[in-house]
Amino acid sequence: MAAGPRTSVLLAFGLLCLPWPQDVGAFPAMPLSSLFANAVLRAQHLHQLAADTYKEFERAYIPEGQRYSIQNAQAAFCFSETIPAPTGKDEAQQRSDMELLRFSLLLIQSWLGPVQLLSRVFTNSLVFGTSDRVYEKLRDLEEGIQALMRELEDGSPRAGQILKQTYDKFDTNLRSDDALLKNYGLLSCFKKDLHKAETYLRVMKCRRFVESSCAF
């Protein structure tokens, strides 16, 4: 009998709850396919969380008539644009797994500081009650990417810190128009960067483990 939606949800939840292996030489070792599955699920969850947060913040604070012009002004705002990383799936497929993991790690680490104030921006719980857990979720994904890097270590030189700048922290003064625009821009970059990290992880998973979900 084919697995139903409930089975799929339970499986996904189970994978999200699995801990990352702290020692790759420990027994029993987690299969590489499971490491990738865990990382992809976590990245998808964070990307969706970021997209939902952006939309709800926009709906609550940004007048509809101003959204398009503000979004255009945000086009070159993200510091992550200074990273020579692939901009989409096709470009990502031209890079090695280790390169994609390093880019993913840089993107995740650039947000560890800024998101620590994210829960204060959403004191009224605009879209989700777990905004105070975003930092922990990012650290969890960081740990998963590092576990994959240990597994796939190929002896190539480690990349230095490419990101020269990082993001400002979210502003909790929501009575200021400047603060609102700053937070709106940060949420836009957060969404874009997590989409990149998710894309890189999915490309790696798909080319190592051919599956029907590779079409994305």
From Swiss-Prot:
Listed GO MF terms: growth factor activity; growth hormone receptor binding; hormone activity; metal ion binding
Positions bound to Zn(2+): 45, 198
GO cellular component entries: extracellular space
Keyword annotations of the record: Disulfide bond, Hormone, Metal-binding, Phosphoprotein, Secreted, Signal, Zinc
Pfam families named in the record: Hormone_1
Recorded superkingdom: Eukaryota
Subcellular location: Secreted
Paired cysteines (S-S): 78-189, 206-214
UniProt cross-references to InterPro entries, sorted A to Z: 4_helix_cytokine-like_core (IPR009079), Somatotropin (IPR034975), Somatotropin/Prolactin (IPR001400), Somatotropin_CS (IPR018116)
GO biological process assignments: animal organ development; growth hormone receptor signaling pathway; positive regulation of receptor signaling pathway via JAK-STAT; response to nutrient levels
Modified residues (Phosphoserine): 131
The family this protein is said to belong to: Belongs to the somatotropin/prolactin family.
Described purpose of this protein according to its UniProt entry: Plays an important role in growth control. Its major role in stimulating body growth is to stimulate the liver and other tissues to secrete IGF1. It stimulates both the differentiation and proliferation of myoblasts. It also stimulates amino acid uptake and protein synthesis in muscle and other tissues.
Protein name: Somatotropin
Organism of derivation: Equus caballus
Lineage: Eukaryota, Metazoa, Chordata, Craniata, Vertebrata
